C-alpha cells in the first residue's frame, strides 16, 4: 500500500562524526531554516529517486515497481516488472533522461532470473498512450543475491554511468572483460562512447566491490562514488577514467598500489546513494545515504582542492536505514530502506521524505 500524507515537520541533526557512525537515534535539534516532510509512506524498499523539472518525483521499489509522485502528492504506479526478488536484487536504479520533458525516457537497472542464473540489465523505457516500450541497452551484467551495485546517473557530459557490483565473485572486479565490479559509461542509446578509456568497452573504472552512489561536484565536474567495503573499509572515491580501485587485492588502497580512496571508514556504515547540492549556501557539499550507519552524511570539501575533506557531519538521523538521497531545487530527497530485511521497520516504513535546506 502506498499513501501520501501531509507535511510533518520534524527535527534534523547536525553532529560531527569522524570515520564512525552513531546507532539509530531520536531526531535531534533542527538546523535553523530546515524542515522535513513525509512525501510517501508504507513503501516496499524504495531504491532510487529522481525529480523532473515539474517537481514530479520518480522512484523505484525493489519489488519491481516504478512510481511517480505528482505535484499534488498523489502516488501513481507507472509500470511494474517481474524482477528477481532475492537478497539485494530487484528493481534498483532509475534515471530520467536529461531531455525527459521532450522524449519521456526513463532508464532503469534491475535484476532478472533466467535459465542460466541471475543477471542485471539496463533498459530505457517509454510510456506512450498507455503502452510501455522497453529497449535493453546493456544485458547480462553478472548478478547475485548480494553485490549488484545498481546506481545509474547521467553525468554532466550527457553520458549514462552505471555502477555494478562484483556479484559476490571478487575477481570479476579485476577482469576487464567482465561488466561486474565496475563503473560503466554509455551513450543514451546504449552504444559505447568513443572517448571511453578502454577501446570498445563500457568500462570506465574497475576494481570495485559494490558501488552504491554516484555524484558529480558542480564546481569542478569531478565524479565521486560511495562503495561498500568488506566488514568495514567503506569508501568514498574520486573516480578517474581507466583507474583501478584495487578490489579484491586491497581495501581502501592500503598499500597505495591502486587508486587511493578519499575517505575510508574504520566502522561499517554501508554508504549508498550520493548527491551534491548544486546551488545556494550548500553548493559543492556532498550528501550521501548510509544503511548501516542510519544517517545522512554531509561532507564538506576544500574548494581549492576537492581531493581534501574539510569536515564530515551527521546531517540527519532517526529515520533508520537510508538508501538514497537526491538534491533538487533547494530540497534534499531521502529514501529509507527499513524493509530490506536488515532494518527494524515501523508501520509507516518505508518512506520518501523531503528536507528543505535553509
Model segments located where?
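Beta-propeller domain segments
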Residues: 24-29, 89-91, 99-101, 167-313, ...
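Surface loop/turn motifs at the tips and blade-to-blade linkers of beta-strand repeat domains
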Residues: 38-44, 79-86, 137-144, 202-207, ...
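Beta-strand-rich domains and repeat architectures in extracellular enzymes and scaffolds
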Residues: 38-64, 270-275
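Conserved beta-strand position repeated across blades of beta-propeller domains
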Residues: 47-50, 95, 153, 215, ...
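Generic structural signal for coil-to-beta-strand starts
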Residues: 56, 65, 105, 159-161, ...
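Beta-propeller domains
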Residues: 58-79
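Blade-loop segments of beta-propeller domains
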Residues: 74-98
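Asp-box/WD-like beta-propeller blade repeats and closely related beta-sheet repeat scaffolds
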Residues: 119-153
Amino acid at each position: 500500500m502506498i499513501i501520501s500524507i501531509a507535511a510533518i515537520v520534524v527535527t534534523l541533526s547536525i553532529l560531527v562524526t569522524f570515520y564512525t557512525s552513531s546507532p539509530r537515534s531520536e531526531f535531534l535539534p533542527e538546523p535553523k531554516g530546515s524542515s522535513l516532510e513525509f512525501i510517501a509512506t508504507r513503501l516496499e524498499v524504495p531504491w532510487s529517486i529522481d525529480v523532473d523539472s515539474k517537481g514530479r518525483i520518480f522512484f523505484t521499489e525493489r519489488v519491481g515497481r516504478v512510481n511517480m509522485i505528482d505535484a499534488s502528492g498523489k502516488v501513481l504506479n507507472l509500470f511494474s516488472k517481474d524482477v528477481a526478488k532475492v537478497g539485494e536484487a530487484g528493481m534498483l536504479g532509475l534515471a530520467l533522461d536529461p531531455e525527459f520533458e521532450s522524449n519521456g525516457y526513463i532508464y532503469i537497472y534491475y535484476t532478472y532470473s533466467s535459465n542460466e542464473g541471475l543477471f542485471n540489465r539496463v533498459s530505457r523505457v517509454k510510456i506512450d498512450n498507455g503502452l510501455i516500450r522497453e529497449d535493453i541497452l546493456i544485458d547480462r551484467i553478472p548478478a547475485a543475491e548480494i553485490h549488484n551495485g545498481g546506481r545509474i546517473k547521467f553525468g554532466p557530459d550527457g553520458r549514462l554511468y552505471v555502477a555494478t557490483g562484483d556479484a559476490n565473485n571478487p575477481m570479476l572486479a579485476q577482469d576487464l572483460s567482465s561488466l561486474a565490479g565496475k563503473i560503466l559509461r554509455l551513450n543514451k542509446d546504449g552504444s559505447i562512447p568513443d572517448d571511453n578509456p578502454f577501446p570498445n568497452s563500457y568500462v570506465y573504472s574497475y576494481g570495485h566491490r559494490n558501488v552504491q552512489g554516484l555524484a558529480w561536484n558542480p564546481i569542478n565536474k569531478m565524479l565521486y562514488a560511495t562503495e561498500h567495503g568488506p566488514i568495514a573499509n567503506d569508501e568514498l572515491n574520486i573516480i578517474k577514467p581507466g583507474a583501478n580501485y584495487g578490489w579484491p587485492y586491497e581495501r581502501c588502497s592500503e598499500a597505495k598500489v591502486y587508486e587511493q580512496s578519499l575517505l575510508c571508514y574504520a566502522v561499517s556504515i554501508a554508504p549508498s546513494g550520493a548527491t551534491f547540492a548544486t546551488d545556494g549556501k550548500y553548493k559543492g557539499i556532498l550528501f550521501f545515504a548510509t544503511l548501516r550507519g542510519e544517517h545522512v552524511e554531509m561532507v564538506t570539501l576544500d574548494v581549492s582542492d576537492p581531493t581534501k575533506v574539510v569536515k564530515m557531519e551527521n546531517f540527519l538521523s532517526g529515520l533508520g536505514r537510508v538508501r538514497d538521497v537526491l538534491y533538487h531545487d533547494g530540497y534534499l530527497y531521502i529514501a529509507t530502506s527499513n524493509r530490506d530485511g536488515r532494518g527494524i521497520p515501523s508501520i509507516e516504513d518505508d518512506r520518501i521524505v523531503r528536507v528543505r535546506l535553509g
